[in-house]
C-alpha cells in the first residue's frame, strides 16, 4: 500500500474519481487543504463524501508555497508520502514543487508552470516551432488595442491563469475587446483566493473543429490513449457542450493531432509522470495547439475513455505519481464510442422544471445527472454553469454523440427557467 498526499481538488467529478482510483488500487491518501468548508459545501448527493476515505485531512495555507514546502516536509517526516497529486489546475505547479522538494516522482516544476500559464505555453511552443495561433501578451490597454489590430479581428481574449473557459471570449472589434478586458480586470482573484496575473493573452481566432489528445507519460515515454472530440457553444464565450471518444476523424487527421500534441509535450518537457489533456484545433492549415493541460481531462472525458477502452486515466495518474508504470492495456468493453452532452442554460433565473424521469433507464444511457428544481441558474459563460449531463454509448460505431444529442433535445423540451 502506498500513501499519497492529495493537495486540494476540484469539487466536480474528479473529486470522486481520483479518491476512487487511490482506494481501488489499495492505496491511502492524506488530503491537504486551506479551506475544508469549500468541500463540505459541495458534498455530492446520493454518495458518501470522497473525503471520508482520507486517512488524514490537514489544513494548511496551500496558496503560500514558500511556507507550505517546509510544512509538507515536516508532515512527510511523520506520515511518509510516496507520491503527491492534485486534480485542481490551480495547484498543479505547487504539487510539482512539493514532489521535487520531497524527492518524489513527478514532472519538472518549470514544465508544469509553463503548461499552466497560457502565456508561457505560447512562448515555449513558439520557440520550438510547434504550430499555434498568432498571439500577443499585453497588460496596458493601449498595448492591448495595438496588438489586437496587428493580429486582426476577430480574435480570442484569454486570461493566462484561469480554467474551465472562464473569461475566454471571441471579440470582433475594439468595443468588444474593451468589454472583455474590463470583465477580466474585474476578476482579480480566482475562486481559490489566489491573486491573478493582470495580463491579457490575445490569440488569432482559429477555424475548424477542436479535439483533445489524451496521453500518459512515464519514464520518458509518452503514450497516446486516444483523441476526443469537442462541441462548443455559448458564443461569444467558448462553453464545452459535449464530447465523444474516440473522435470520428479520418486516420490522417487523428495522426496529425496526435503528433502535434506529442511535439507540444516534448517542447514543454512533460514527458515523465504526467497524464495530459492537450487541446488541438484542426484548422484548414493543419493542427494548431490550443492548450496543454498537465492533468487528466475534465468533464468526465476520463469516464468516456474507461467505458470504451477499459483504461482508467485517474488510476494512471496515481500510478505515474508513484513512479510506477501505468496499466494502459485495452479491453473489449463492448462499446465502440461513448459521448457526453451537457445541458447548458441560455438564460438566468430559477430552475422551475427539468423532467429527467426515465432517462437513466433508456437504452445505451450510461449516466444521467440533472439539477433539481429550485436551483439558481446563471446563463452559461464558462464550463461552470451546467444544469447536468447525459452520457451514452454505442456498441456498433461512432453513434454515441447522435444518441446524446437526441436525449438532450428531449430534456430541453421540458426545461423551464424563470
Outline where the language-model segments fall:
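ATP-grasp fold ATP-binding core
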Residues: 125-126, 148-171, 189-208, 213, ...
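ATP-binding N-terminal substructure of ATP-dependent carboxylate-amine bond-forming enzymes
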Residues: 1-111, 142, 371-385, 393-418
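Conserved ATP-binding module of the ATP-grasp superfamily
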Residues: 131-133, 154-157, 171-207, 240-243, ...
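A conserved helix-loop-beta module that forms one wall/lid of the active-site cleft
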Residues: 101-167, 191
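ATP-dependent carboxylate/phosphate-activation module, predominantly the ATP-grasp catalytic core
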Residues: 203-270, 282, 293-316, 332, ...
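Short beta-strand-to-turn element immediately C-terminal to the catalytic PLP-Schiff-base lysine
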Residues: 138, 168-173, 216-218
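Conserved protein kinase catalytic/activation segment
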Residues: 286-287
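Peripheral (often C-terminal) accessory segments that flank ATP-dependent C-N-forming ligase machineries
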Residues: 127-128, 318-418
